[in-house]
């Protein structure tokens, strides 16, 4: 009986997506709400550590950090347990990556978007039982078609995922099945063998 490492486990996740560009690109294109002309084509890995600018600043580390050929940054986190602080940490890390793009000689027009993809192995939005992908942007209070571009956040509640809930993105289904079912499938097979 073959045994697989849980792809959600910290080290396994970082090995898969932090060392294999093609897998990371596929994951980003499948799970982020990117239009056809916005798809990621190639990436350059960046240090996952966001070191503070001075000794009193807060150090932070993400699971995977990269940028594409357009200069957009992508932060990817796999979080096993939801805590209210996690959402704040995500905002902190994305904001830090965003503001660090410019030094005092560069113009604001050169800022590129930062996308934060957060896979959570716990249900945290119980009020929305049928929704498991949550996308956030900075939008106008009254006119949600008016947005300030720059920071985008995607949270995915893995336990809510059912393969039939996504129809338009086949790769999204495959990646989410990989993240949620590979270890469960092995466990079921082992129980069947023991029975």
Task: Tell me what each language-model feature is.
Residues 1-195:
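Elongated, amphipathic alpha-helical interaction scaffolds
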């Amino acid at each position: 009986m073959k045994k697989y490492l849980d792809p959600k486990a910290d080290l396994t996740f970082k090995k898969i997506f932090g060392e294999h560009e093609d897998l990371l690109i596929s994951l980003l294109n499948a799970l982020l709400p990117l239009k056809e002309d916005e798809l990621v084509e190639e990436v350059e890995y960046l240090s996952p550590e966001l070191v503070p600018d001075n000794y009193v600043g807060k150090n932070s580390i993400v699971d995977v950090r990269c940028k594409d050929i357009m200069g957009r940054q992508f932060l990817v986190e796999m979080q096993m347990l939801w805590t209210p602080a996690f959402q704040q940490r995500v905002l902190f890390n994305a904001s830090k990556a965003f503001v660090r793009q410019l030094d005092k000689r560069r113009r604001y027009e050169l800022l590129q978007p930062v996308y934060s993809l957060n896979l959570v192995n716990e249900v945290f939005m119980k009020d929305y039982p049928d929704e498991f992908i949550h996308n956030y942007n900075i939008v106008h209070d009254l006119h949600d078609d008016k947005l300030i571009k720059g920071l985008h956040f995607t949270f995915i509640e893995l336990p809510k995922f059912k393969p039939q809930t996504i129809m338009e993105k086949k790769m999204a289904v495959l990646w989410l099945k990989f993240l949620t079912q590979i270890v469960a499938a092995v466990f079921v097979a082992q129980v069947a063998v023991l029975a």
